[in-house]
């Protein structure tokens, strides 16, 4: 659910500023969302955004919180009649009715394992400000966030069992001069951001070169507090192929460049979290 034109200031002043049960009038946004895929995945979040924080200048401020849990598949699934029939059909050439085991179907949901899971929750606060220099198209934002990971027999990270904490600050300098946020016909966009955690390994007095990557106890201790510095650069340029004044829906040629770098403070303590994926945006 998304409530636009929300007003936190009018929350305790019912009357003409209310529309139904919600206060209106300040252009703020309140968003509450939930997503679930039965027993395997659940996600809940709430956020508040004020584009005119303070009421006098277009300074943005937001608060948000989220919680999610994802479970894994039991090893019994891969030994089920469904999987066995699939592999048997591949190697024996049986492509008929029995290949899909319709008569004895073992559905995926019967094999979820609640003991194998990753739980995450976090909170964040963001402040953004328009800049006058170098020009009026620049904006600076700063976000302080905290996430906690709770892993139970989760085989997709070096830390399979444990609790990891991620406290970071994200600083972003951006510029946008596009003429339309939905269908840009001209102008450009760019952003340069850095996300930093405290360099714990530089002052905790621990020699991480002696930690073993095959020991779960060592991995839990090493990544109890995650550390990294993450840099990202994104740029888009929109070039109209026809005169945008004369042709409202002119074809547009877009050029795009993106760059990302995940760094570490200690070569023996590299973060398994916040990494980049091939084909993803990090």
Describe every region a protein language model picked out.
Residues 1-183:
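Gram-negative/organellar outer-membrane beta-barrel architecture
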Residues 2, 152-282:
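C-terminal outer-membrane beta-barrel translocator/porin domains of Gram-negative envelope proteins
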